[in-house]
Each structure stands twice: as structure tokens, then as C-alpha cells.
Amino acid sequence: MKIAFLFLTLDNINWHYYWDKYFDGHNSKYSIYVHPKYPEKVTVPWMKKNIIKNLVNTEWGIIVKAYINLMEEAMKDPKNMKFITISESCIPYQSFDNFYNFLKKDNIKTSYIKSLPIKSYDWKERIKKQKNYKDIKHWRKHLARFCLSRYHVQILLQKKEELKLFYKMHVADEFFLSLLPSSKFIKDFSVTYDNWDYIENEIKKINKKIEKLYIKLENEKVNNNKNKINNKINDYKSLKAKISANPKSYIKVYKKDFNDVNNSKAFFWRKFPKNSNINNFKNKILEKI
């Protein structure tokens, strides 16, 4: 059994030396496939030599076709039995052996997809705006980082017509696995830890501030002051929309953050931008992988 690592990036992965250590000594157990937005900027050797030929334009929220192209290329190797999506801000957090053995203990058909609740906004602004959305019998929302079995990738790639709906749908990377039938071979588990709890708490704080401003607005008599309050409300709404688009970005990492990822049992961790201080904990991470 081999694991196909599907890297979807802008150019280089942000923290490649963690991956250097992760892959070291396991050559026969993995394959690498890379879809960069800017292939000419890729300099990491193991990424550069594994860039797939069929590249497509990507932007935030529009990446499903790139995922499919990565899967199609990875399926050419019959030894690839598991397919995991990796972003540029992701680092490994457990050893390769730990992940490999975790995958082997379940049925070979098993995929790991973390489900999310479909909110009213999703139905209104994303799903129902698709012309043929009713053709999808059972909509599923999920994290965009997942690990699929060869069994499920085969099913997915056979649905060429149905996939077209997701190529232009915004944030379809959180919905396109709706094409997979419900199955005992799908486990509700995220192999990659994203800190959405932090974002939810920040949104709650913003909502409280907005609520207080609305109360203040009701009691305000001066029009000029009303305009100022409305501007503040709109600023908070814009901030809420901005931060709700992504999980926490770890520019500053603290010791307590490790408790969260440890409790999740995940094998990978994100998001770490290039200006993160994650290297303050370099030895701690290298010891784990």
C-alpha cells in the first residue's frame, strides 16, 4: 500500500524541512503529486520533480478541478491506495509510520472525511445558486482536507458530468464529496487539524459588539452619530466575513496550542503562514515526526 500525497499550493510548501524529515526512509510507501498555481516559482526539489502536467487556474474557493487532476494522476499508480490532500500551510504532526499504520488498521476502502453542518447561508448563497443543484441527492459539507481511499476516488472520477457543477461553485472543495454515497467505509474524522473553534469564538465576540452597537443605535437621536455607529457595525460585519473564511492562521504559536492538536488526534496541522513563529518549536515537532 502507498499513500498519495496531493499537494495543492501557490508555489513552495511553507515549511518543507518538516516534510523532508517526514518522508525520509519511506520511499516505497508514498507518492507525491503537486499542483502549484505558480510552477515556475517552485524550488523545493521533491516538489519540483512531482508537478503534474495537467495544471488549471486556481483561486480561493475554486480548487476542485485541481483536486480532480491530482487524483487522476495519482490513480495511474495502482499501488496508491489512499489519497490525502495537503495545503502549503500544512505540516506533519505525527510520524509517517503512525499515519501509515492508522490507515492499514481499517478496511482498505475506508475514507476519512470530517463532516460539517450545512448552514442556511450555504444553502442560499452556494448550493441553491447552482443551476442543477437538485441533481445531487444528498448534499454533504466537509472539511477541504481529507483522506480518500482508492475505492472512493474511483467512484468520484466516474462522475464526470456531476463534477462540472462543482468546478465553478464557490468553496466547492467543502461540498464536492457529496457525490460519494453514504457508506460504512466513510469515517467522520479529520486527519488534518484546523482550528475552527478559535474562529467561532472570535465571531461570537464580534456578534456581541454588533449587538451592543445596534442597541446604541436605537437610542441615538443625532443623525451624524447614527452614521458613525452604522459604519462601525459595517466594519465589524466585514471583519466577521473575512475571518470566517479560514481556520486560525498560526502567526504566533504558543505552548497551549499543542494541547488542541494533541486532543484532536490528527496527523497533520495547519495553517502556518511563512511568517509563523513555528520554528520556535522546531525540535518539539521534529521529535514527533
Describe the role of every protein-language-model region.
Residues 1-289:
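ER/Golgi luminal nucleotide-sugar-dependent glycosyltransferases, focusing on the catalytic module
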